[in-house]
Amino acid sequence: MQADRIYCGDALTVLKTLPDSSVNCCVTSPPYYALRDYGVDGQIGREETPALYVECLTSIFREVRRVLTPDGTLWLNIADTYAGKGNQGEALDPKYPNGRTGQIVALNGKVEGCKAKDMIGVPWLLAFALRADGWYLRSDIIWQKANPMPESTKDRPSRCYEHIFLLSKSRRYYYNAAAVAEPVAESTPARMRRGFGAGNKYSADIPGQKHQHINDHRPDGYAASEIPQLRNKRDVWQINTVPYRGGHFAAFPLKLAETCLLAGCPPGGVVLDPFLGSGTTAAVARQLGRHYIGIELNPDYCKLAQKRIEGGEAHEQTLAPAAVYRRGAGIAGTEKGHPKSGQAHEEAGKGRGEDTQENREEKAARR
């Protein structure tokens, strides 16, 4: 198997050709149910019912789980859809055609078990199906958008978020919390120095002294250990959508892909995106020193993604039938002799004879 490669074809068909345990992480955003027509046969999201849509994606992610290393994770972005009256559901403002979600394509808007105007609950239908299929459902991350697309509805709040589900192949998996840690609030250090007295909720995390006040340990009010300046990343991520002029309806924000990759894919590892679209996951992987495997059904998007990867954030595109695109050499057994997927992060730093901070962080990332 070769890394740094885009396969142009059906996701399930291509995935079946990939070897077991060959990628470290999957970051992807499949086409949402009944929201877009991407103009190619065999596209996902045009199924007659949500149940068929979920069934189709479950079979694809079953193959994703097979090709993941035992400590691999899946970062799955998905949004919901509303049931309609038999012709279509609710739509966004048609004046804004390049949003992450958009005008609903008319299928059969009636959904079994749902009334007209009901929120279908597609993200959770899919999440529960994946859990039942063997995935560990670890987190429901809310992607909050300060610049959401306008909606024409007047009888409910406008949507400003999507889901990112973190799922793992095994109970123990790679997650680099340090790589995505976020700054604590400015008021936190001062409150910690004041201690656990009336009106304060902070106490020192010192073995054997569960309720010891922080300000009891040093005269200046600091604890014996340094007051942390970073905290574990929360599960609400504020990331704005960014218009992409390359002709793809639903470009993934670079920052969103970056966060998932830093947390879920070790340096030198391989990330998979079976719904590559305009190539955001692959482009970010290359920038961060990771390898990528991309799969995309639409030949035009295959070419667009390759141009974007090679030119950074290049917006030009040459629309032509695409075969298989590749960059550089492969992973194992190739002329450049890259380590096998899943081994790169384990072997980093070996032979140097020292316990470096980088190595310690890598070890800590394995839960």
Q: In which residue ranges do the predicted regions lie?
A:
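Juxtamembrane/interface motifs at transmembrane-helix termini
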Residues: 323-325
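Core catalytic lobe of class I
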Residues: 1-312, 320, 331-355, 359-367
